[in-house]
């Protein structure tokens, strides 16, 4: 599976999580790319909750991605910490 990041995602993910945690997220998506809930009316964008640091999923991160099934590609689009909201 190929991962493609938008420039804004790349910038955000370096601030939001360490490299080893991002690798865990990528592995989780390789194993279950359908894990994120589809955002209604988005054309297939998905939002996944991901724990961050010492906090659980509820206080962690939200990451937006698109899974292109025929191309076997995940586009990492955006992310934010729930604490930023």
PLM region descriptions:
Residues 29, 64-65:
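Short, charged/polar low-complexity linear motifs in solvent-exposed/disordered segments
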